[in-house]
Structure formats: C-alpha cells, structure tokens
Regions:
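Extreme N-terminal leader/targeting segments of oxidoreductases
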Residues: 1-44, 62-66, 87, 152, ...
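C-terminal, flexible cofactor-proximal segment of oxidoreductases
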Residues: 3, 7-15, 280-283, 316, ...
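Beta1-alpha1 glycine-rich phosphate/pyrophosphate-binding loop at the start
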Residues: 3-18, 39-42, 46, 51-136, ...
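Rossmann-like dinucleotide-binding core of oxidoreductases
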Residues: 34-41, 45-46, 51, 55-68, ...
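Short FAD-binding loop at a beta-strand-to-alpha-helix junction that anchors the flavin cofactor
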Residues: 101, 221, 390, 458-478
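Feature captures the FAD/FMN-dependent oxidoreductase FAD-binding
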Residues: 110-204
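A conserved short coil-to-beta-strand element within the FAD-binding core of flavoproteins
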Residues: 138-155, 393-411
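Core beta-strand elements of the Rossmann-like FAD/NAD(P) dinucleotide-binding domain
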Residues: 182-196, 243-244, 411-420
Length: 639
C-alpha cells in the first residue's frame, strides 16, 4: 500500500481555533490526511544471513506492508555457521528433522544427524524458494552502527568486498590469505539508513586460536576448526586422501572436537586427542526411538550407530507426509522434555560411557565428569568413544606445554610428532562485538555490556531504540529444540516493526526497569539486598554447578550469559506476545494528537474505491471456531 510519509498535515484539515476540548487545551487538534491502513514506508536492516536472517527475509515482507528490507551477510554465501564451518565431521547434533523451520518439512535428510553441507544446502533451497536473494547482500560486512536520536534512524556502515578476478570466492584454497600472485579483494565502504535494526548473528561467530606457546613455530598444517576450508572440493572428505598417512592432533573435548575425532580416526595413520576437561556423552538422542519410528529391528537399530537413513525410509518420508509429520512431532515432543536433569539419566550416561570405554578404563576415569548432566552442553557424539579405543588413537590428558616445530609437548615431558593439528578450542562468547553499535548518548554497546551483557528477554537493550536481536545473550537453551525460539524472537521483532509502522512511531525502546527485572529474574544482582540468590532462576539450576562452559564465558563459575532462564517452551510463551507496557515510545509526527495514526477515518480500499471492501469474509481472515469446543482447549492452543 502507498506510504503516508512524515509530512505535516495541510492546514485545511486542522480543527478550528478557539474550540477547546474538555481537557482545556488551546483547541488545536490535527487529523492525518492518510487512511488508517495507508502504511508509511519502513526500512529494516538485518545483520546476518543464517537461520535468523533467512527467517527475517521471509517474515518481514510477509507481515509488514511497504517494507524496504536489506540483509547484510559478511560471508560469500548464506547459512551462517553452516556456511562457515566445514571441519571434518561437521554435523547437526540434534535430529535434523527438528532442525528446520516449522513451516518447512525437508523429508529427504540422509541421516538423523545430518552433515553440515546438507543443512547449508537446505537453507539455500529455502532462500531460493522464497526468492530472498533480492534482499540479501553477500560479502557485505557491517562495521559500525549508530542511532541518530533526532530522526530515530540507524546509520549502518557497511564494508563491501569484491573478490579479485583471479580466484572465485569459494575456491576452498587456503585459509583466507591471498595466494602467491593473487590480487587482494577490493573493498569499499558505504552507509545505509534504517528505521529498524535486527542483529541475527549469535555469539558463536568469532573463533579464537588457543594461547599456547610456540604455536607460530609449528611447521605442519594447522587449523582452527572454524577457520578450516577444504583444499580439495567443497567438503572435508575431499582432503582425506592427502591426510591418510598423517599424524593428526585434535585439541579439545567439546562437541566440535568430538565430531572431528570421530570423523578422522578411521582414516589417518595416528591421532592424538588433547583433552583438558571432562564431558558427558549421551547415547544418540534417537537411538531408543528408531525401532518404533522406522520399524527397524532392535539389532538393526543398534548397528546403525550413525543413524544413517536407509533409501526406503527416506522414500517413505517423501511419499507419506503424514508419517513424516508424526515422526517429527514425536522427536520434538521427546526433545522438549527436561529429562536430563534427572539423576537416573546421569547414572545411565555413566554406565553407557563406561561400557564403551571398557578396554580403556583410564580414559573413562579422566573423561567422565563429576558435575551434573547439562552443566555443559550435552552432545550425543556418535563414534567418539569407539574412536578413542582404536589402537592408533591416543587420549592425552596431560596439559599442553608448548608447540614445537614438529609437534606438541605436554607437561608430563612427552612430545608427539604431528603433521596436522585441528584446534577445536571454541569461540569468543563474551558478547564483545567486533564492531561498534552506538545507541543513545553515544553509548557503545560493548561498553554497556561490560562485565557482562544485560538484556530484556534476550531481544533488546535499553538505550538502543528500534534495535532487536535474535540469538542474543541468554537466548540459547540447554535442552530441547532451538528453532521455535528463533522463530518467536524474529516474530517479536516483526511485531515491533508493525507497531512502529501502524502507530507512526519514531522510536520504541525498552525501559531500563524491565531490563533490570529480567536481570533479577536470572541472577542475584549486586547491590540488590532485597533479592536473594535463592529467589533467582539460575542459582537454583544445574547450570550453576562447577563446570567449565561457554555458557559462563568458559569459566567453571560465574554469571550465565548463554542460556535462557527456563525451558525452550517457556521462552516461546514469553516472547509470543510482546508486553508493550515495558516500552517507551516517541511519535514520528510533530502533532500532539496521540491518536494521529487513526488518520482520516477511512481505510485505503474505501478511500480509493478500489479493492475488496468485504475482505474480512475471505477464508484467510475468517477465524473459524472448532465444531465442538473442548473444555480445556485453551491449554493446547497458542494463545
């Protein structure tokens, strides 16, 4: 629909002077010259084209009329972490059938834990299906964002990279350094301006090499898992042939290291896994459901440790949508149970790990944690414990002392000669962003978020109007399905943009008191004598137990900045319907009339005598009640 703009209303539409209303004002009252649904243009900038950015590309044009949308992605392709991470064994660590949008139903996943390139390819299919490349700008990195208070606009500085003509952007040759004789990519910067800014990049984006002495002296092949790019082909399997006779080191014991060890151990000459901490490994989530869901025998279910789907099973998913929907619903229902908190599960996990490490009891002693299940991220890790038991695989628990030119020396005096080292040593999860976001009063978000981030429901920050976040601080879950939270968080930002457009608002900003109260809900706040630790969420949870976790900035103790304070279903309910009274507003128009957005008393179809004036009878708008209302139907309905 045409936009109403920001212009003042012609004097002819203003009320006559000298006719004060009942409140005793001076009688000046302004009506808008636009229809109530003649929505003004609104510009939205999204940073990142992973799951959140792709969803924003679908929902903003779907829900917001007259929207101008741009999605800036610094990488050369879409998919976020699934485009950038190509390390050996990269895969989804939850059933892939649950790792897709609620309105998309990919039925031909090759495995329950699908490889990363398959997830990225699916996201590309979604982008193509909804024609989102018209909004997405690849190789465009946001380097600065500043809120302008007088106009209520975000000024976003963008660095555009143009690849050199001598090498394609995704050649897979090397680690981002120019090759000999290759021209460096050309860069230029420009500024874009928007009414609404949505950050959609999450915390797990900036990887870091470990601070180990001698790292630069190592003469072999060295990669951080997040920085690795295949040299041969588009996936890591293309490099297996040249790695086959190599001695490989893998540093780490988190979910990434577990996948790398599992993938490489069967294919290399020797492998050493350097492990500093302990970790729980659960049986693959779906193993106990395979028999019922796929109709396999018990023996077949136990034999398929990687949970690869058989061709006939994939074909049934494709040909029988009802069957696929039932399987997906069963998986997600089971994942959303908070069962990992129960002590009997801890006993079951311990028993399972001890059985698989029966021939390596010294590994079980070092690897099995003393802290509760879910204190750290729980991973199924299919094949990892089996890999540790192979004769050519070494489990090294002695701390690393230094790199040498040819390998790694540990504190116990042992040195292993290595040809290839993968550092699965994590990311900078401090939420100190790589670029400045400047809000009201010139406050930098990085400064505001020291020593740790504070938000409102993980989606916005006081002092930063018209800015929303998907996968912001305290948005991830320790157990359950993540995608419903992501969808609801993006939907929250869309609802806020719709409110701004409909009510002609210049700014919408969460109150500082609301941020403070969410902070109190999660943790005891320093200086708050009236809030005891036992009255906040995290001090009573398993996540506060002593274990090193990225939830707590990689520390054993400290504030939890990664997790939502509740279940994933709790997060969905909290974000589903915004509590607008927790916000403050500024109007876009100078008139004092707070109901200026009502316009001239007409709708656009009436005003133009065009279009459908009985649209409310169309099927998509009719809210049909069920034939027989059940007494407790409200418990099930998404109200």
């Amino acid at each position: 629909m045409p936009g109403g703009g920001f212009s003042r209303i012609p004097p002819s539409l203003k009320a006559q002077d000298g006719q004060p209303d009942g409140d005793g004002d001076d009688g000046r009252f302004t009506l808008g010259s636009f229809s109530i649904d003649e929505y003004r243009p609104i510009k939205v900038i999204v940073i990142g084209a992973g799951f959140s950015g792709i969803l924003a590309g679908i929902r903003f044009p779907q829900k917001i009329p007259n929207v101008d949308l741009t999605i800036y992605e610094k990488s050369a392709g879409i998919g976020g972490t699934w485009y950038n991470n190509r390390y050996p064994g990269v895969a989804c660590d939850v059933p892939a059938h649950c790792y897709q949008f609620s309105f998309e139903g990919k039925r031909d996943w090759s495995a329950f834990y699908s490889p990363g390139h398959e997830i990225q390819a699916h996201l590309q299919e979604v982008v193509d299906k909804y024609k989102l490349m018209r909004y997405i700008r690849l190789s465009h990195e946001v380097v600065h964002a500043r809120y302008d208070e007088p106009t209520g606009k975000w000024h976003v500085r963008v660095r555009r990279t143009r690849p050199s003509s001598s090498s394609p952007p995704d050649s897979g040759e090397g680690e981002g350094e120019p090759h000999q004789g290759e021209e460096e990519a050309e860069e230029e910067e420009f500024e874009d301006v928007a009414d609404v800014l949505l950050t959609a990049f999450g915390a797990i984006t900036r990887w870091k090499m470990p601070a180990i002495p001698g790292l630069a002296d190592f003469k072999g092949e060295l990669h951080h898992t997040a920085g690795y790019t295949p040299r041969s082909g588009r996936t890591w399997e293309g490099d297996l042939e040249r790695w086959r006779d190599m001695r490989v080191g893998v540093i780490g014991s988190g979910s990434t290291a577990i996948q790398v060890v599992s993938a490489l151990a069967p294919h290399v000459a020797r492998l050493a896994n350097y492990v500093r901490g302990q970790t729980w490994l659960a049986p693959p989530f779906s193993m106990d459901m395979v028999q019922d869901l796929l109709g396999r025998s018990k023996k077949a279910a136990e034999d398929d440790d990687d949970l690869t789907l058989h061709p006939e099973e994939i074909e049934r998913f494709k040909s029988d949508p009802g069957y696929f929907d039932r399987v997906r619903h069963t998986l997600e229902d089971s994942m959303n149970r908070d069962s990992t908190m129960q002590s009997d599960f801890q006993k079951m996990f311990r028993k399972g790990m001890e059985e698989k490490l029966a021939t390596r009891p010294h590994i079980a002693e070092k690897l099995i944690p003393g802290f509760p299940v879910s204190c750290r991220r729980l991973t199924p890790g299919p094949g990892y414990l089996e890999a540790l038991c192979l004769p050519h695989v070494d489990f090294v628990s002695s701390p690393i002392k230094r790199f040498t030119a040819t390998g790694i020396e540990t504190e116990d005096g042992q040195t292993k000669e290595l040809d290839l080292v993968f550092c699965a040593t994590g990311y900078d999860t401090s939420w100190q962003l790589p670029f400045a976001i400047v809000g009201r009063g010139g406050v930098d978000l990085n400064t505001k978020w020291r020593p740790h981030p504070r938000t409102y429901l993980s989606v916005c920050v006081d002092g930063f109007p018209n800015m929303f976040m998907s996968l912001g601080p305290n948005s991830i879950i320790g157990a359950g399905v993540l995608l419903p939270i992501l969808e609801t968080a993006v939907g929250y930002a869309v609802q806020a943009a719709a409110k701004m457009q409909r009510e002609r608002l210049r700014s919408i900003e969460v109150k500082r008191s609301a941020v403070r109260d969410f902070d109190r809900y999660m943790e005891h706040v320093d200086g708050d004598d009236d809030v005891g630790c036992g009255q906040s969420y995290f001090p009573q949870s398993v996540y506060s137990a002593n274990c090193r976790s990225w939830y707590k900035l990689g520390k054993e103790e400290g504030r939890i900045i990664g997790l939502w304070p509740g279940s994933n279903l709790h997060a969905v309910k909290a974000l589903q319907h915004p509590r607008w009274e927790d916000y403050e507003y500024e109007r876009a128009d100078p008139e004092e009339n707070s109901l200026y957005w009502l316009g001239d008393g007409q709708t656009w179809n009436e005003k133009t005598e065009n279009g459908d004036r009985a649209w409310y009878l169309r099927e998509e708008f009719v809210d049909r009640p069920p034939g027989m209302l059940k007494r407790y139907a409200w418990l099930l309905a998404p109200i």
